[in-house]
């Protein structure tokens, strides 16, 4: 198996004055076509099922889109913000998920300015529940990082 990398942006979207967290994958690294995936995470807490069957990426819904710079907030707002109305607040954290040949997973949480990073790992051979829990914890940490930063761009 080859190593696979995925990038996710976790923004905060406001609809009717309620805050929701959504995970929007932007590109699969090394792909000129800019494949992405969409999975839901409300307020940074992932559903335990999270649409991830036997491997962490197999259950993601893939869709084709143009590659986009990860840290371009104006482009981010243009691409995703208007799908949810005009009350978009802020992009929050970027999460990189890497699936390694030994079946281990690495999750890196980047701040939106790209200046700081935290890493969480899940060893090869871990049960699916542990992989899901690790990603859930990464999303919760991302949500905590969001709360510490200014709301508006």
What are the residue ranges of the model-derived segments?
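Intrinsically disordered, low-complexity regulatory segments enriched in Ser/Thr/Pro
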Residues: 2-36, 98-133, 137, 141-146
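Negatively charged, low-complexity tracts enriched in Asp/Glu with abundant Ser/Thr
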Residues: 46-94
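Short acidic DE-rich linear segments
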Residues: 149-153
